[in-house]
Amino acid sequence: RSTKISDNSPSSGIVIRWNDCEQTIDGFGIAQAGWAKELFAFKNRKQVMDKMFGNDGLRLNILRGEIFPHYWENKEDKDFNLNDDINIELCDSDFNNKSDDLLRRGQLWLTLEAKNKYHINKLVFSTWSAPAWMKSNGKVSNGKLKPECYQDFANYLAAFYKAYKSKGITPYAISPSNEPGYAAPWNSSLWTADEMGKFITSNLGPTFQKENIPAKIIFGENPLWSVVMPQLKMVSSKDFTDTILQDYPEIKKFNLIAAGHGYSLSPDIMPIKVDKEYLKTPIIPFDAAEKAHIPVWITEISDVTPLDTSIQDGLKWAVTFHNYLTKANVNAIIWWGGAM
């Protein structure tokens, strides 16, 4: 139906197609993850939470956290530190520390607040790195998961689910790897599509089934949505998810979410001069996931440039979100980060 806005307005119209059904929208959210301690220590943290999740705020319905590598610090350690005190007075000197302990407490407080006060039920958690003792280099940055620790890692993720559920904060989805193609200097772990396909089909998926864990398994989550330049395929989410679904068709029997991140490339970061056309990251569908009726989420997107609160920047992001919804057919969008 076409409707004229007013007698004085330019000739325009809005057409509503009631019977054109597109993808289901699972929601919109923010990631806090490694920034949980900053929000936990902020004196106006409750006002910030209201702005993000409250009825008078953005009314977001997804929160993305991290499965930290410092929960199980050795093979005998099975503690997720969920009995730590989170009711610390904001004037407490503990908030001056930048410790793993404060990060764990911060995420626990944030997740409980999101669930209990704002009734957020889409709580998703990504893993930047497995515990160091499971890694090829014995560190939480770079390296790979040792093949002999694949089942240990699957057990770790299952135990995390059960531990958080015991606190009334049931994870909706779990990702075994954040940005598997990027060896970041912070918590990180490299995976090929073949390694991830094997791990999910042989270890994580069967473990979740055996333990009756209904959480969805997120896979993909590379820094770029898609690429034009073949040499960049290792950081392309579309290539990563397409390869897994093609080479491991049995993976489709599990409860999955195919995901990607929406960062862009600048010629300035390339070691050699590259034409801008080759650095494009097209916003296109994940065809293999769509064909298999697997939801597609963008689990991280942001801007690496300085903060810009202008309407011009706001409109730029409105167009970007619109393109992901209408061109890539995503089911959810998560912004990095909620409060930094």
Where are these regions (language model features)?
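Bacterial Sec-dependent signal peptides at the C-terminal "C-region" and cleavage site
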Residues: R1-D7
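Active-site cleft segment of glycoside hydrolase catalytic domains centered on the general acid/base Glu
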Residues: A132-I244, S264-I283, A288
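N-terminal catalytic cores of secreted or lumenal carbohydrate-active enzymes
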Residues: S11-P171, T192-D194, S202
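Solvent-exposed loop/turn segments at secondary-structure junctions
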Residues: A33-K37, I67-W72, S129-W133, S177-A183, ...
